[in-house]
Amino acid sequence: MNDMAQRIAPAAIRKEIEVNAPIDRAFSVFASRMGDWWHKEHSIARGTSQKDVVIEPRAGGRWYEIGADGSEHEWGKVRAYDPPRRLVLAWQLTRDFQYDPDFETTVEVNFEERDGKTVVHFEHRDLERMGADAVELLEGMDGGWGMLLGLFKAEAERG
């Protein structure tokens, strides 16, 4: 990679989806029931499978995974928790999906009520903090978030 390519910051991942569910339910499924829709293979637990994903419902709360063996694995922190409109999370997983309390990118999710449905505006930004490989990582993360948001949509529409 040349010097010019290294200076180009990767764009944020931005997604917008329409969910056929009221805003309160869409927010609740995203923030309180992440373990119901998060892909179980997208786990950082080693030696165990994923049982749940928890977002503590307050600014300053934890965002973490619970393994089937009861172990807890940090993913990040809750920066803003404003039901049913906005959720901001600090993603503290490095490009190797290792938790690092000194590392942070930002996941922001905004919920907009429109004609009895909910439009979800998703953004994962500050990806340049991933380092020299950030541009290459962006493609995989973009696809991963697209898949996860599809799973979220299906769960929210089921109720």
List each language-model region with its residue ranges.
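Hydrophobic ligand-binding cavity/cleft-lining segments
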Residues: M1-S49
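A generic structural micro-feature
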Residues: R7-A9, G70-E72, Y99-F103
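Hydrophobic/aromatic beta-strand elements that line small-molecule binding cavities or substrate pockets
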Residues: K15-I17, W75-A80, E104-E112
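Hydrophobic pocket/interface hotspot
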Residues: A26-F30, W63, V78, L89, ...
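Short beta-edge strand/loop motif at the mouth of beta-sheet-based domains
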Residues: R33-H73
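Short, conserved beta-turn/loop elements at beta-strand boundaries and strand-helix junctions
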Residues: D82-L87
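Short, solvent-exposed aromatic-acidic interface loops
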Residues: Q92-D96, E123-M130
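A conserved amphipathic terminal alpha-helix motif
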Residues: V119, D126-G159
